[in-house]
Structures are given as C-alpha cells and as structure tokens.
Amino acid sequence: MSNSESVPHVDPGAAPYGNFPNYYSFNPPENRISLLPAELLHKLFRKPAESDSSTQPLLGLDVGCNTGDLSVALYNHLTEPHSKSSDVPVHFLCCDIDPDLITRARASNPFPDFISYATLDIMDSSAVRGPVNDFLQQFARSTFDIAFCMSVTMWIHLNYGDQGLVTFLGHLANLCDYLLVEPQPWKCYRSAARRLRKLGRQDFDHFHSLSIRGDMAENITQILTAEGAAKLIHIFGNTSWDRSLLLFKIQRHPC
C-alpha cells in the first residue's frame, strides 16, 4: 500500500492495520508507562556539553500512534517535573497510517509545540522521507534519539510478511539511536486472524505462510541484533497483556 489515504474504513473489530478507533479504551497507556523508569532520559541520553549554551533537544519518533494517547503519556513521562532530565526539551513526531486517527490526535493534542502528528505509511519509503526528514532538519539532526514501536510489529508482519518485518525493523533502526519495541506475542496473531474470519473478511495475505513465528520477542531481538546492528540493553517486564517492552541501543559502525 503506497498511500496512507487509501486505508479502508472497516468494522472496528477488524482493523487490519491495527487502526482500532477506540484502542486506548481497552489498552490504556498506563499499561506501558507503569513499566518504564521515570529516569529513562537521564540514564540513556547524553548530557548537554557544558560549553554549549543551548540544551540539545531529545527527539522521539512514535510509529503507529493511533489517536496519540500513548504518545502524550510518553511525552509527559519523559518530561515530568521530578525527572532529573525534565529540563531537556523533548519533541515527538508521531505517525499512523489512518488519517482519521491522526485527525483526532491533532484535535486533542495538548502540546502542539512539542508533539507533531503525521499521516503516513511507514512501509512506503518515499512517503516517509518527506515528513521524517522535514522534522529532523528542524533540529539539524539525521536521527531520532529514540523511536517507539508499541504493538505495531504484528500488523507489519501480517500485512507484509517475514521480509516486510525484517525491512521495517531495519528501517526503524536506521532512524534512531535507541528503539523501544513492544512486540505482540504469537497468540495475538491467531486472534487477529480469527477476528477477520468471524467478520467475513479476507484473511491476512501472509498469515499462513509466515516462517517467523513462536516467541516473537525473541525473534525480533534476533532480527535487530543480527550482525551487531543493535544491542538489547533492557527488558522492562511484561504488560498486563503479556507483552514485553524491549529497549535496544542501535550500534553505529564507522564506514
């Protein structure tokens, strides 16, 4: 799919791209936020150079942001007053394939100067290049400090297959220095396929042909860490939905 505007308006129970219209009513942001240490920024990111009179902002990319509830919760969590890094300005670019969800996210955005929303298909490299590059260029940067990929990998995998998942993770790794991933376990794949069948919808093109299956947290870790591309540095436990939060540091190798 090359155009995010072509996302069909489907029964809320189907949502073949994970674009559930009321997603946060049954999976509230607190399910993830409660697992993340309040000092995440302070521990991960470099401090501004003492000789630099300006504070280097922290840039975050949230892929598959839905209506933005989790994006806002992450922003609040990373800038909360008791954090030692709360004086570091934080700017988020948040994207989703569904234009209706992005419209709702923009309408309810409490921090329009710090959180930006864009409708885009993350698998369309030409579509991504514009808004992503434009955002980074505002800060004279080539990568984000951190990217968030929260309950997105399954939808990429089901719609684009094994190679699509590998390509997606590689693309994200190229865009950031740290990557926080919340993979859906394999049982969620079966549930997603079953929902489509119950609604009389066509099954996911790749569901039955996937060879990457089983322990998806382990599979995604293997994909990201292959050939030293990234290092798994922390596992923040499991959410109430039995989903792991995996933090990777992307390894930049000199040419």
UniProtKB/Swiss-Prot annotation:
Protein keywords: Cytoplasm, Methyltransferase, S-adenosyl-L-methionine, Transferase
EC number(s) from the headed UniProt entry: 2.1.1.-
Pfam families: Bin3 (PF06859)
Record-annotated Bin3-type SAM domain positions: 41-253
Reaction it catalyzes: a 5'-end 5'-phospho-ribonucleoside-RNA + S-adenosyl-L-methionine = a 5'-end (5'-methylphospho)-ribonucleoside-RNA + S-adenosyl-L-homocysteine; a 5'-end 5'-phospho-ribonucleoside-RNA + 2 S-adenosyl-L-methionine = a 5'-end (5'-bismethylphospho)-ribonucleoside-RNA + 2 S-adenosyl-L-homocysteine
Gene Ontology terms describing biological process: methylation; negative regulation of pre-miRNA processing
Class of the enzyme per the UniProt entry, highest EC level: transferase
Cellular localization per UniProt: Cytoplasm
Task performed by this protein: O-methyltransferase that specifically monomethylates 5'-monophosphate of cytoplasmic histidyl tRNA (tRNA(His)), acting as a capping enzyme by protecting tRNA(His) from cleavage by DICER1. Also able, with less efficiently, to methylate the 5' monophosphate of a subset of pre-miRNAs, acting as a negative regulator of miRNA processing. The 5' monophosphate of pre-miRNAs is recognized by DICER1 and is required for pre-miRNAs processing: methylation at this position reduces the processing of pre-miRNAs by DICER1.
UniProt name for this protein: Pre-miRNA 5'-monophosphate methyltransferase
Organism: Xenopus laevis (African clawed frog)
Lineage: Eukaryota, Metazoa, Chordata, Craniata, Vertebrata
Gene: bcdin3d
